């Protein structure tokens, strides 16, 4: 199963919850052109195995795929006798939801492998307990996320978006981004009702102008190289540049047909350390 990355086109922090999480309102968009691959099969001899290739990842309980498999087996009273093969291409701890996407794929593949499709409705609760982004990846289509991000409403987006994703090569923990989130005084996101209207009727340029992320201000302060990347992307014609999720990956919304040239320009300046992906949302 191919497991897509995502961006958060819009992310607004509404407040902190008693459980330590934050209430947010976000717009999830899946992207085509950057994904991992997850295969789940019965293990022979019986036992549980996780094999990772591609980008380095732990193949133990620190891996969300492992935890998803254990949670599934416990919930459905199944002995964990499976082999998971994970080919990792989405950058890790990057704000692109790669681990969450992989975990959702494990849940879905186990459901099919164990012929439990009639109980698919039970996956949402499992997914939400594992991570706030994982429910989105059970059915990765444009959506509004509320609560911790796990309460989803379908969303139609009028214009497909041509994007560059630029990952600077270092991770940023989700916890750090939320702990240090601070919106500059006087800055406000667009009213959500207006954002919905733009997403459903607006042009690519109007959608780009409505993008927002409350987490990015702290990330830009902490890592000046990201501000340099952002400035260069804007100088070379990007319509907007924002941090995706908790970062540090940047997404640049491009004029239609311009992403290849922009990728070439940015690779010439920053390609020695940054990974650049040309994708669509």
Role assignments for model-derived ranges:
Residues 9, 38, 65, 99, ...:
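Residue-level signal for inorganic ion chemistry
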Residues 30-32, 128-129, 135-138, 154-159, ...:
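Solvent-exposed alpha-helices and their adjacent loops that cap or buttress functional pockets
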Residues 44-58, 106, 128, 201-212:
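Short, basic/glycine-rich phosphate-binding loops at helix/coil junctions
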Residues 66-81, 108, 209-228:
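A short, flexible low-complexity segment enriched in Lys/Arg and Gly/Pro that occurs
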Residues 81, 103, 107-144:
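Contiguous, small/hydrophobic- and glycine-enriched helical/loop subdomains that border
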Residues 85-114, 132, 239-251:
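Glycine/serine-rich anion-binding loops at beta->alpha junctions
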Residues 139, 143-240, 257, 264, ...:
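Conserved, helical-rich catalytic subdomain that frames metal- and/or nucleotide-binding sites
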